[in-house]
Amino acid sequence: EINMMEFVEGVKAKETLGIAQILEGSYEGKKIRMNGAVHNVRDMGEVAFVILRKAEGLVQCVYEEGVTNFDIHDLKEESAVEVLGTVKAEERAPHGFEIRLEEIKVLSQPAEPMPIPISKWKMNTSLETKLALRPVSLRNVRERAKFKIQEGIVRGFRDYLFTQGFTEIHTPKIVARGAEG
């Protein structure tokens, strides 16, 4: 059924949650939907941990054989998925909660395995390889953290200078690297 306002405005209400929404809301014990990329799958037999990667960080999901409506062996790293499950507090999980899975819907799967091991904490690849494969290497939590730290430092300087009455400018005459011409 089509909602006419969605059709006219071109906007559809978001049906999935982010990490921040779960942390600020009272979702403990409630069913939620969440999208993400499969960062890692740790199969322990009857139970498996599916780690989802979102822009805000990692989310631990718990797969239980016979409870979750999906075969865990069909799940590949870097698949885009939508999960349905119940939020449970778990202090050992990232952000202090986990999702007990009921359903996993694969939205897309990678055509081939990643050229570098992005789910490992330390990728053990050369700088040249990391730079050559930058869009892929930035999916690694540790590599991304370096940029988050840099962003925080720059924002701190910018905020301080703003409070001191400075004006931020962006001019083509001042560039970060040597320009040709």
What does each of the following model-derived ranges do?
Residues 1-181:
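Class II aminoacyl-tRNA synthetase catalytic cores and aaRS-like
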